[in-house]
């Protein structure tokens, strides 16, 4: 019985970790510290006139591939 409870707890814990990390992608940011420090960076987006429209966290791993 305790092994089943432990297994359920570990599955839920792993799920929370992955959901929390993925939730930062496309989140608004002011600088790189607002994003996940190892896999994301704060990207600046511009409107059609070239003016800064905002900043969002982007996946840095995609830049390496």
From Swiss-Prot:
Mod. after translation:
Contains 2 disulfide bonds.
Record's keyword terms, sorted: Disulfide bond, Protease inhibitor, Secreted, Signal
Alphabetized GO MF terms: peptidase inhibitor activity
- Which residues are the signal sequence here? 1-23
Tissue spec. comment: Expressed by the venom gland.
The cellular component terms of Gene Ontology attached to this UniProt record, alphabetical and capped at eight, are: extracellular region
Q: Does the keyword Disulfide bond apply?
A: yes
Where located? Secreted
Q: List the disulfide bonds.
A: none
Q: What else is known?
A: This species is an endoparasitoid, that contain symbiotic polydnaviruses (PDV) in its genome. PDVs, used to overcome the host defenses, are introduced into the body of the host larva at oviposition by the female wasp and have been shown to be essential for successful parasitism and development of the parasitoid inside the host. Interestingly, the coding region for Vn4.6 is located in the opposite direction upstream of a gene coding for a C.rubecula PDV structural protein (Crp32).
Q: Per its database record, what is this protein's job? A: Endoparasitoid venom protein that interferes with the activation of host hemolymph prophenoloxidase. May act in conjunction with other venom proteins (such as Vn50), by competitive binding to the zymogen and thereby interrupting the enzyme.
Protein name from the UniProt record:
Venom protein Vn4.6
What is the species of this protein?
Cotesia rubecula
